[in-house]
Amino acid sequence: MIIANVIRSFSLTLLIFAALLFRPAAAEEFSASFKGTDIQEFINTVSKNLNKTVIIDPSVRGTITVRSYDMLNEEQYYQFFLSVLDVYGFAVINMNNGVLKVVRSKDAKTAAVPVASDAAPGIGDEVVTRVVPLTNVAARDLAPLLRQLNDNAGVGSVVHYEPSNVLLMTGRAAVIKRLLTIVERVDNAGDRSVVTVPLSWASAADVVKLVTELNKDTSKSALPGSMVANVVADERTNAVLVSGEPNSRQRIIAMIKQLDRQQATQGNTKVIYLKYAKASDLVEVLTGISSTMQSEKQAAKPVAALDKNIIIKAHGQTNALIVTAAPDVMNDLERVIAQLDIRRPQVLVEAIIAEVQDADGLNLGIQWANKNAGMTQFTNSGLPISTAIAGANQYNKDGTVSSSLASALSSFNGIAAGFYQGNWAMLLTALSSSTKNDILATPSIVTLDNMEATFNVGQEVPVLTGSQTTSGDNIFNTVERKTVGIKLKVKPQINEGDSVLLEIEQEVSSVADAASSTSSDLGATFNTRTVNNAVLVGSGETVVVGGLLDKSVSDTADKVPLLGDIPVIGALFRSTSKKVSKRNLMLFIRPTVIRDRDEYRQASSGQYTAFNDAQSKQRGKENNDAMLNQDLLEIYPRQDTAAFRQVSAAIDAFNLGGNL
């Protein structure tokens, strides 16, 4: 019993001793606080604590300061060591033989950096190199993006090897791990399914051509195959095959469905009715541009697919165009026709021609004759004394009037008095003339933009242009008729805004009065005032296009030498003629742009109101209704509204109202 107790006590003691002997030692912890410590001393301290051999590059210099309030285990202490060196621009290279090498970060990428793998990726700030193969993304396209996320100025580096489509990434293990995550998400195979899109109306080949053309910008961006949708035409079934990334594929399918629509017209011929333009005028324009359109379309097609000629005809009765063309050319022509078939603005051109003529003349002469000594004769008197004496002798002889005297008297104007006694004769002629001529014309005309318009009010005057006497003493005269009156020819061009360029030809002509003209057997004399010019004026503005202020003084004296110069008595031996004429001529013009029906109606109503007011003042209100049949002009009824009065006031400013 005693022996058994002793054995039991001895066994318990052995168990306690064994437990104490084989108890694991407590993990060693390190302090991580350094202040102003030389970096090499810091490296030596860590090397000693971790029991690692460290080789320090001679370029490693400096001091460090770091503070930690926690105790770190061996692994934490090593990562702390790597992080501190990283902050100060140094890196640690693990030589895989228990030796560590401390170098500058920029030199680490060319050192013997260990190649990491999925099994040994590295931890924290360890410098590692990783080889990453890519399957769906081009390495040359992804490398620039990854470089922006890596520390390229320090230990980081990202390069690509295009033949194998791999990335070579060097850097801190934590950074490389983040870059790997990005690569895995980007290098996605995607969905490469093929979708067949049947077509009901369009041609598969034409649709593929259009889609490919529209998709050129996407292709030029050099995206990988998974990001770009591909389209192929199946002409056998008239369908389009689409493959690619789902989003791109859906975008292409939606585009194809928009193109596959029924045409508005059947066949290639269409009748287009015009609203404003003249069909015959558009045919020449459209024929010219359609040949260019067809050349551009056919240049992109194979020879077997060339279109037929484009045919454009005009139907005058309905003012319509009949167009035969391919659908694509037809659409282009319709757009051009829509832009040409617009309501063109018009221009109301109003002109004022104001002319005042005033002429005064005085002819006075005395002629003497002596039967034996001779005579003084002045032809500017209109009646030579020799003709008068010969006629008087003829009359005294047989009581008849000679033809020469009759002709002279018929063409003479004024007074002629004298005596014929014995051998002496005297003839006094006198003529005073006064001519006044006032012209006020206010022509107006409306025309389309860029269309020439002519306004002509006058009469045709016969003019002798030739005379011929035949063998039978018959006289044949050739007569032409010359139009005299008021002519206005204008071509307006509306520029940007409301300015109008006017090409003007204006003429005011009349037949000169017999008393003031030099007419003879050659025919009448015409007074002509013409203006040909171009002016730029704003709509509604008045501009002077021409003017003339003319004064003419003519003083003629025919006299007997010496005797005609004697004061007072000399008047008996001379003939004088004096004429003073004045002429004032001004031409004004005012264009008004008319863009719509309301403006046209307003302008027409204003003209009618001004005309009616002028006639009322001239003939009296009681006769006005009898002169103008209101039933015929009910489209322009007289109204005393503000709108009509506003137009009338504008025209009154142009001197139309009451001065016709």
UniProtKB/Swiss-Prot annotation:
Region feature (S domain): 598-660
Family membership noted in the UniProt record: Belongs to the bacterial secretin family. GSP D subfamily.
Function noted in UniProt: Involved in a type II secretion system (T2SS, formerly general secretion pathway, GSP) for the export of proteins. Required for the translocation of pullulanase. This subunit forms the outer membrane channel.
GO BP of this protein: protein secretion by the type II secretion system
UniProt region (N2), positions on chain: 191-264
Xref: InterPro entries: Bact_Secretion_Sys_Channel, GspD-like_N0, GspD/PilQ, NolW-like, NolW-like_sf, T2SS/T3SS_dom, T2SS_GspD, T2SS_GspD_CS
Region (Secretin): 346-596
Keywords: Cell outer membrane, Membrane, Protein transport, Signal, Transmembrane, Transmembrane beta strand, Transport
Keyword Transmembrane found: yes
Organismal lineage: Bacteria, Pseudomonadati, Pseudomonadota, Gammaproteobacteria, Enterobacterales
Quaternary data: Forms a cylindrical channel with 15 subunits.
Species: Klebsiella pneumoniae
Signal peptide: 1-27
Region N0, annotated ranges: 28-124
Region described as N3: 267-341
Name of the protein described by the UniProt record: Secretin PulD
Residues at the site labelled May serve as a pivot that allows opening of the central gate for substrate egress: 458
Localization terms from the record: Cell outer membrane
Gene of this entry: pulD
